[in-house]
């Protein structure tokens, strides 16, 4: 007999099915403190209905590349005992948009710097610590320094 009461709790299987995640993902989220459950008399996990929306927030955030540690920090700012509201989502997504924009900008810069290495191929350009950080021979300029012009080994 199904309980139609809006406040009823969800089993781990129900929550997994409704959220579109594996049961193991819910267990993982719980061990990371992203969601919580109560145990019933039979020692089975029971999740509040609000947890469904939290899992959806986790999934969306993960899909756009937000690290779980960031998601956990964000979820800690939400009040317990209620589903995240539209205002909660607006606040979280605004912060995540800022972070994503910053990461995208960094990735675009890295991509553009990487293009400069294609012609050289030696990965010892002194202009870019990304390509070869701490290069001992970078003071001698770009290019391979252990080979002479004909490609023979050279005593450094």
UniProtKB/Swiss-Prot annotation:
Disulfide bonds: none annotated. One of its GO terms (molecular function) is DNA-binding transcription factor activity. PROSITE patterns: HTH_MERR_1, HTH_MERR_2. [2Fe-2S] cluster binds at residues 117, 120, 122, 128. GO terms for biological process: regulation of DNA-templated transcription; response to oxidative stress. Keywords: 2Fe-2S, Activator, DNA-binding, Iron, Iron-sulfur, Metal-binding, Transcription, Transcription regulation. This is Redox-sensitive transcriptional activator SoxR. It comes from Pseudomonas aeruginosa (strain ATCC 15692 / DSM 22644 / CIP 104116 / JCM 14847 / LMG 12228 / 1C / PRS 101 / PAO1). The lineage of its organism: Bacteria, Pseudomonadati, Pseudomonadota, Gammaproteobacteria, Pseudomonadales.
């Amino acid at each position: 007999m199904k309980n139609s009461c809006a406040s009823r709790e969800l089993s781990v299987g129900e929550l997994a099915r409704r959220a579109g995640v594996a049961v193991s993902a819910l267990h993982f989220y719980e061990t990371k403190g992203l969601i919580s459950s109560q145990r019933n008399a039979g020692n089975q996990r029971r999740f509040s209905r609000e947890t469904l929306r939290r899992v959806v927030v986790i999934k969306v955030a993960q899909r756009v590349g937000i690290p779980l540690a960031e998601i956990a920090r964000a979820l800690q700012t939400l009040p317990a005992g209620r589903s995240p509201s539209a205002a909660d989502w607006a606040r979280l997504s605004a912060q995540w948009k800022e972070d994503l924009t910053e990461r995208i900008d960094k990735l675009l810069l890295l991509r553009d710097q990487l293009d400069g290495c294609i012609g050289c191929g030696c990965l010892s350009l002194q202009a870019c610590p990304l390509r070869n950080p701490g290069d001992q021979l970078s003071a001698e300029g770009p290019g391979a320094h252990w080979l002479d012009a004909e490609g023979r080994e050279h005593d450094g």
